[in-house]
Amino acid sequence: MNQDTPLANLNGPEVPSGNVPPANPPGRTNVAPPAQGAVQQPPAPAARRARNPHGPVPPAGPSRSAGAPAMLELSAAYPMYTEQRRAPNYYVPDAQLLFHTLGVCDQLMTTTDRFLRSMPSWLPIVSQLYVSVLWNVMILKVYVNTGYGAAYAHDLDVLLNHLQINECMIPGPLVPFFQSLAAVNGPFDWIGDIIPAMPSFTELWTDEFAPHAAYARQIPIPAILLDQLYRFATLAFDAQLQTNYATFEWYSNIFNQDVNTHNARLRLGPQLCGSLFTTQAQCDSARAFWNPAFANGFTRIDAANGPLMAFPQLLGFISQDGALQSNWFMHISLIMHKYAQYFNGSVPLKSISPVGIGASVIYGTPLEDTNVRDWLYPAAAAIAPFRSTRFLPRRELPATLAVRFAHADHEIEEQAEQYSILCHTNMKWYVNNATQNNHTAIEGNYIHQGEYWNFTPFRYSPPVSLKTQFAQVIASRYHQQAANRAE
């Protein structure tokens, strides 16, 4: 035996008497110092999940799993499957808080001398008409982009590629409202997409020459606003007065029908949540511009001349006899391009993404309140015609309006919740406040369609009341007394 070979230990290897000392950890590599002069920003947090809508997808068949040994082979012959609920979940966006916010902007602009001198043709109803067009176009843009709004694809193509509405500027304070419309996929793979939608023309516009009762408060109809601007500009007045400032009444005659003839739902639109107040000087200068502007190439809608037949007529771009009329929008877009320069954060419509934020999954429910009920279902006197001397909106948001927001998405980001709470674009007005004053009740199946809206929510907000808080932020953070330079 080799003398260098150790003898075997018959009792086995020795057991250590203590713990094994830990291995030496690798040394820490220090982070390289930032380059001098470089901007240091924290990385943006990644989204918790992909937000792009799935689009129309056929239901999946039952899944198959591998067999199991022994007794489990009996149940393996009956594999479970996921029930696909991929039907889309629609909601009709609400624009009432949007126009309240626009009303705050308009109040600031009535005292912005540089703007008024450069745009004597501006009036608050011009702002309302412009925003109502952009709002409808944005809804169509999202709806068609998801693959579900094919019926509106041609109309959208004309609006974006021929009228170039994608280039129109959105005033900064209104940008979050447009961003909140983005479509998203459902909270689970087997839940359908959640999409803001536009009702079909026959659902939106009734044979009574008025919007459907469920949509009258939520969807602005540009044709109604255009009709009022035309009547303001062309209605004759007493030559001795030299002005119609103290005599002209908004909404006293709509589509050539007076207040006792036209449907009262024409006076429930969301634009009436904003004020039409202006000074006499601005009123007179605007009329001097719009009177000749409407002289050629425009025909006013007349309810006596037969029903409207297509959605572009509600936007004001097609007359009752089918003729294209878009000169009025050219004037308005020029005015509002200058208007947007007086607000920080203004962006073109084309910059708003149709997918991604996630605010669409969150909905608000108003608390029961007498003032809110009177606002939703007003008495005739509360929606009567009014003059430009009236400072308050005709349908002013009630100060007691409180809304509780909720959703059933387990991965939604807090920023999406903030967008929804701020903008109030997904609302269940049909809950908690019953109809009155002979109004037709708002029915939920017209506003929300799809199984997601029936899921039990698990995230809630406290009651939210933002009406009086917009003015401070807009005045201090957005509005400028001098126009921002175009980039």
Swiss-Prot record:
Residues 1-66 are annotated as: Disordered. GO terms for cellular component: T=1 icosahedral viral capsid. It comes from the Viruses. Keywords: Capsid protein, T=1 icosahedral capsid protein, Virion. It is found in: Virion. Transmembrane segments: none annotated. Residues 30-41 have a biased composition (Low complexity). Its main location: virion. Signal peptide: none annotated. The capsid protein self-assembles to form an icosahedral capsid with a T=2 symmetry made of 120 subunits. This is Capsid protein. It comes from White clover cryptic virus 1 (isolate Boccardo/2004).
